[in-house]
Amino acid sequence: MCVHASNFRDLVPNPKSSLCDTENSSVICAVAFGDRMEIDMINRKYYQDILDEIKGAGLWKEERIITTPQSASINTTEADAVLNFCANNYLGLANNEELKRVAAESYEKYGYGMSSVRFICGTQTIHKELEAALSKFLSTEDTILYSSCFDANGGLFETITTKEDAIISDELNHASIIDGVRLAKATKYRYKNNDMQDLEAKLKEADAAGAKNKVIVTDGVFSMDGIIANLVGICDLAEKYGALVVVDDSHATGFVGATGRGTAEYCGVQGRVDIITGTFGKALGGASGGFTSGRREIIDLLRQRSRPYLFSNTVAPAICATTLKVIEMLTADNSLVNKVMDNAKYFRSEMEKHGFDLAGKDHAIVPVMLYDAVLSQKVAKRMLEKGIYVTGFFYPVVPKDKARIRTQMSAAHTKADIDKCVKAFAECKEEFGF
């Protein structure tokens, strides 16, 4: 027996009625169970139809499984000893022996986890030491730690703006910025990627609308394109129109700029960027965790009102200890920074010799443009068969008809590794005719 939910209530006896003590109650239970099964079938079909649509459009994303530590050469369940050209392991530190030693030692001194948010009982000396070290490294006044940079961006904009303010965001900003901006009550504006003329137009619109405060936010590096933001132009306009500048430097902190201080150093605008967000999950060891660094008053306000900070567990002590060690290494030696950038330049020059359409410049991210989603997956699969691990990116990660294989160079790659990767791409180019 099956009934519609709207009619089911009429069949349920009053709890005070003697019917509840009769065999009728078992009938009601059977009806309820049947109704629940029907609803479950409808729900399952609804979501399965969405999944089938994704697969039919060639947009299904597979997760390959790695069976070794993250490194330049890895094993997967599909192939052994493949060269990894799709990790954010820019400095090659994800499996660094010194960092593993520091992490192991930290367990003895600080334990495994904190089981608390920061303001209750989740702050150790190691957390404050890392915040101070990051502030010194980035030449900012103060720093606050988050479980991820996604949380850092998610908890920033609603905290520092009100409905009287305006947020002007680059159209290609990371999803975490987009989601963070959505949470804010401020009026939102979006400007064309790295387009200073359009940014100025949006600043004028915000002024005309009576915005009390204005915040410009951009990725330091647009991660799908390998393009570095025009921070000189952004800072010039921010000063002209009295706006704050926020830069997400997740794909820059630790390896972009002469000493790895990020895009502000690369663009020569250190001291002109008000707020920097970033991650420990890429160049700085590759584990997890994020941060926001900037003016002391802003950081203090985040400690008081930023919801991801107040309601998420603190960063694990071992991550703090290893990140401190990475900052120490970068402060003492630029060799890893130089190596990853040299590798990127070499890879780009060799790929251009074969006529590949490459996006971006001056960065370890070198996207190989293929435009077709299905082709990007076929090429990625064929590359793995040739011993090269890369991933095809397509909608909704990138715009439709802009599919690509995003390669990422690491300081751990050798010239021979890069030559093998270029050779495999060249063979795929001939095989698939792109």
Task: Specify the residue positions occupied by each region the protein language model found.
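N-terminal "arm"/small-domain region of PLP-dependent enzymes with the aminotransferase-like
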Residues: R44-Y112, A243
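Conserved PLP-anchoring active-site segment centered on the Schiff-base-forming lysine
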Residues: L156-A175
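PLP-dependent enzyme catalytic core of the Aspartate aminotransferase-like
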Residues: E97, R101-E105, K109, A132, ...
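Conserved N-terminal alpha-helix of the aminotransferase class I/II PLP-enzyme fold
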Residues: R101, E105-C149
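Active-site phosphate-binding strand-loop segment of PLP-dependent enzymes
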Residues: N89, Y189, N193-V247
